[in-house]
Structure formats: C-alpha cells, structure tokens
Amino acid sequence: MLKKSVKIGESELSIEVGRLAKQADGSVVVRYGDTMLLVTAVSAREKKDIDFLPLTVEYQEKLYSAGRIPGSYFKREGRLTEKETLASRLVDRSCRPLFPEGYAYETQIIASVISSDPENEGDIHGITGASAALWVSDIPFDGPIAGIRVGRVGGQLVANPTAKQREQSDLDLVMAVSRKAIVMVEGGAEEVSEADMVAALDFGFTTAQPALDLQDELRRELNKQVRSFEKPAAVDEGLRAKVRELAMDGIKAGYGIKEKGARYEALGKTKKEALAKLKEQLGDGYTPLVEKHAKAVVEDLKYEHMREMTVNGGRIGDRGHDVVRSITCEVGVLPRTHGSAVFTRGETQALVVTTLGTSDDEQRLEMLGGMAFKRFMLHYNFPPFSVNETKPLRGPGRREVGHGALAERALRNMVPKSESFPYTVRLVSDILESNGSSSMASVCGGTLALMDAGVPLKAPVAGIAMGLVKEGDKIAILSDILGDEDHLGDMDFKVCGTSKGITSIQMDIKITGLTTEIMSRALEQARQGRLHILGEMLKTLAESRKEISQYAPRITTIQIRPEFIKNVIGPGGKVIKDIIARTGAAINIEDSGRVDIASANGEAVKAAIAMIQALTREAEIGKIYTGTVRKIAEFGAFVELFPGTDGLIHISELSDKRVKSVSDVLNEGDEVLVKVVSIDKTGKIRLSRKEAMAERAAQQGAAAGEAAAQPAPAPTQPDAKA
C-alpha cells in the first residue's frame, strides 16, 4: 500500500493506492478532511469498431457515507441524482480530452463517495481521483490533472472552501488543471468582474499543482508500464491528396453558405460526389477501409478549412469575429401561463415559460446532509425536431441536465429571496431550433420570461457562447458561435452575466499556452457581446412587470408569534384544514411564525388572513373585548377573549356593587364585556367587568350628549299650492 499527502487549502489531501479494489486496472482512495472517495478505472482489452472514445463516468454518493438510510421504498440508492449527474459530467469533461486519439476501448471510471464530511464536497476530489486512478494504471492517459474549488470570502480567494465559507462566498468555481494549462472550468458568481475571474483562475491553477506532484510520486514508485493498443490505420497520403483534390473546392463553397440547412445539404452533396468519383477512379481498389478513410479525410478537410478561414479573419456567412447574430424577442406569447418568452438568435430559438408556485411546490432533494429544498428550478429540453432529426422522446439526458444547470446557475442569484418574493419559481426552456448556443438562449429567454411573470429580478441576465482558435501566433476569438464552430476551437466557453459582472461560466480548454492576456481578451469580448444582447432584450421588456399574472397564485405573508402556531394548526391539523376547506387558499406555516397564504382568488386570501388573525390575536392592556365565560370559580370567572387566550375576572371586578357569588352575575357560556387591566410576565391576563361597563356607559353618555347639543332641524315649509 502506498499513500501520499499534501495540504491544499485548510485540509490535507491524501491519495492511497493498493488497499481497496485491487482487481481494477487503477484504484485509489482520495481523502480530504473526512470526505473519502474510492475511484476506480477499468479499460477493456478488446477494441470497438468505432471512431470515438467509449468512456463512461459514474459519480455516486453512498448515503451510508453520511450515516443515512435512503428514504425510498426499497431503502437503497437508485438512479443518479441531478447532483451526481453534474459531478459525473465534471469528471468526464476533465478526463476525456486527455485520452490518446483513436483510443476506442470501452473505459469506465466510477467515483464513489464512501465517507462524507459535511464541510468538504466530494465532486472536485472525484476529478483528482479519476486522474490518479488512470495515472497509476496501465491505461493510456495524458495526465495527471487535479480538481480544485475556488471561492472568494471577504474579497480573499479561498482554495477548497468549507460549506460555511461557501455560504459567504460570492464565487464558486470548480476547475481541473494540468501541469501546463487549465483544462476545465465550471462555476457561478454574484456579478464578478472579468478581471477578478481571471485572477481566480490563476489562483486555482497555481494552488492545485501540489496535487499533481502526489500523483507523479505514486506513478514513479509503482512504475506501471502503459499498455500498447491498436491505433487506427494511418491514412495513405496518396488517398488524402486525391480526396483533397476532389472535395476541397466544394467544402470551401459550402462554408460560404450562411443558412444551416442549405450548408449541410451542400457539404453532404460534396462528400457524396467526392466518394463517388474516388470509387470510379480506384475501381476494385475502393475497399470498405478506403471508404472509411476517405470519409475521415473529408471531415479532416472541413476542420482544416474552418480553422484556416477563422484565423485569417473569415467566418461562416461572412460574419465578423465579434458580431452577434440577429436577435428577436417576444414576451407574453402564451396567454394562460404565468410568464413566457421566445428568444431567437440566428437559427437558435428557445421558448421559455415561467410558472409560479407556493412553498409546497419546492423540490425536495435527498442529500448526504439530509433533506434539502429548492425553490428555483430551470429545466432544459432539447427535442429532436430542433435539429431536424427523429428520435424517441425519453427523459432528460446528461447534456440536458448540464445545460439546464448552467442556465439555472446564471439566473439563480438574480431571483429575489423568499422573504421578499415568497414564490417557488420553475422555468422550462424548450429549444425549438438549434444552431449553437441553445443554453445561452435559455438564459436570455429565461430572463425575459421571469420579467414577463413579474418576478422582480435584481438585474437582467444574458449569456453568450464563445470560441477561441490558436494557430501559431494567430489567435481568433469568436462571439456567438454556431454549431459548426462549437467543436472547432481550442477553447470553448460560455459566459453569462448582468451589465455589472459574471454570474455563470463554463470553459473547456484543449491546448496549453493560453496566457492571462489571451483569456482576458476573450472574456472582454464576451462582455461586449453580452452587453449587446442585453440591450436587444431590454428593447422588448425594459423591466419586470409590476403585477404577476392573474392566473398565478397570490401569496401574502404574515407573521405570527411562534407560540400561536398551535392555535392555527389545531389538534391533528383540524383548524388549518378547516381554514383551507372554507377559503380554498393554500397555507404554509414555518417554525419561525411566518405564514404564507396563497390563492389565485384575492378574496380567499383575505378571508384566510382574517381567520388566522382571529386565532392569533393578542390582548392589549386598556382595550375592551367581548369574551365568553368558560369556567366559574369561587374567586372569579375565566373568560375566553379569543381562541387560546383566556383571562380572569376576579369577583371584586365583576360589579361596582358587592357580589356574594360569581354565579349571581355570570354563568358558563355567557358573553361578557371585559377590559384588560394588566398582563403579567408569565402572560396571565387580569380582566375587569366593572371597568368595562363604566367606560362603555361613559362613552354612551358622551354620545347622547353630543346628539342633544345638535341644533334642531328647520321646520318643513308648507307647499305653496296648499
């Protein structure tokens, strides 16, 4: 067994090899604080006949790691949660680019959280563990890499912040770094500037380097030899030259077409004609392998031409590198929804709809630390018709979950807190057309749909997808990339934010040598594009509507004293159920005494509030009330002023005359006028009937005197005709 440790942030990171899961090709236990992950890597020995890497990553949180039993009927973990899916994507995006080209062997990485420290999240250590498991195995992998989280508390950057620090942080970045470069970035922020974001990236890159040293030390001591594997047969240079001659002119012409459908049709026709001519030229020499290589060459030529065109100032449709496609926005397009918008940018279109609900509609999440509740959700859907394809409709895939999370993170901090806006908010983004940047269209459409619904956003948010291509000393930064440009770049990144700063960012960086200056330039160009998009959006709707939809529930919040909660709920919930049944309003009561009353009918809300206030009224000294006698005693009578609130009338306070027996004046069930004389520290209320009667008599006497003092009305004049 080997174990290496180093301190990163406030805790020690250790990687252990050779104790658990020894039959896997690579297996490590990563520990940070009391959080531990078992990460394994296994790669098949038999190659698949495919042209991509068949990599599967599964990040799973075992509930036993936090001493909990699953709450499901079967009492065991089920399918991956959204959180686990997102963590799996982080590991996948970090590791996938580092496998050798042409490696077509089925590979699986499983990262299992086996001990959970509530102060230290496991996702970033899944990245480090996956790299370590691959690095100590014989699987070909161009590592190592390490995961790190960067926060900012009180203006100071923090590595791997604790849960408490994350609550105070205005930045939450997850990064994967290698020796030479940042590989992957995913994170959210509270309107952080571009300069501060670059500083955070630099900090994370430097701070994570010791985790790479650990992995290198383990690899050296284990001295594992990397396995050999069958590489794809090299393409004959003569064949490459023939295909270039047959296809290159058509490829150049195709990429000059602006419209996506026509461009794809032209490029498809070029490929088909080139293969037909090649078959005619080669005759019997045109084998299935030759055809496969020829098709690969066509794709290589498309990639080559696109990059060459880009670094030399060109672009599909002759668009400038910093030019955003034409934008149209519509709001209020669906009359019965609470808020809706259609955002169209070029050939990408999103229909985004807002639904407002009560706290009962919050999403319940079973987490390692217990149950959690989520009041803002964004769900992203990518139907096949959006790209003119036919596929069966299934549940959301990992890509849809990831895109939805990116857009949700962009908007989350701009949605007001429940104290000022007590609604659960669900956004649904249905992509109707797609030609790049659909997740960013969801952000822009989401902002408009929220504003249309009357959600008082702190600031509107827009998003833009960017690309960066570097060939030698030539650098091209592309704003608002198309689908064809998405995979061509050396850095693909998406930036969302307000006019003030960044709220969400996602980067995948494929090369080394990107300096701070280049990244600053790229983020500045993204900022300019974002501001342009915001300007176009605000032409349609400049601010949130003042009123929510007539079809949305009206939620009114009142505060009662916590000790009165039992009065409102009643035995077995009898009282609150009766209020709900009689008014039709939804009612939620929190332990703090906060009460949310919701209904689309304003009168129902008023009625429910009146009933709750009647149950939670407090007696005030000096005020007169009509109460009900509940109990007679020798020394006085107990009177219920309102439900749950009783007071005592001492026998001496029943009348201004001497009373021998309380029952001579009052009986149980009688209604009686009383005045609150005092309330002691324990809440006991002393009442007086005689003071109430005297005060009421004085008021009536004063009113009678005022009436007598009024001048008599003038006599009616007799009719002139009489």
Curated annotation (Swiss-Prot):
Residues 622-690 form the S1 motif domain. One of its GO terms (cellular component) is cytosol. Residues 696-722 are annotated as: Disordered. GO terms for biological process: mRNA catabolic process; RNA processing. It comes from the Bacteria. It catalyses: RNA(n+1) + phosphate = RNA(n) + a ribonucleoside 5'-diphosphate. It is an enzyme of class 2 (transferase). CDD domains: KH-I_PNPase (cd02393), RNase_PH_PNPase_1 (cd11363), RNase_PH_PNPase_2 (cd11364), S1_PNPase (cd04472). GO terms for molecular function: 3'-5'-RNA exonuclease activity; magnesium ion binding; polyribonucleotide nucleotidyltransferase activity; RNA binding. Mg(2+) binds at D486, D492. Its main location: cytoplasm. InterPro entries: ExoRNase_PH_dom1 (IPR001247), ExoRNase_PH_dom2 (IPR015847), ExoRNase_PH_dom2_sf (IPR036345), KH_dom (IPR004087), KH_dom_type_1 (IPR004088), KH_dom_type_1_sf (IPR036612), NA-bd_OB-fold (IPR012340), PNPase (IPR012162). It is found in: Cytoplasm. Residues 553-612 form the KH domain. Its EC number is 2.7.7.8. Its cofactor is Mg(2+). Keywords: Cytoplasm, Magnesium, Metal-binding, Nucleotidyltransferase, RNA-binding, Transferase. Belongs to the polyribonucleotide nucleotidyltransferase family. Involved in mRNA degradation. Catalyzes the phosphorolysis of single-stranded polyribonucleotides processively in the 3'- to 5'-direction. This is Polyribonucleotide nucleotidyltransferase. It comes from Myxococcus xanthus (strain DK1622). The gene is pnp.
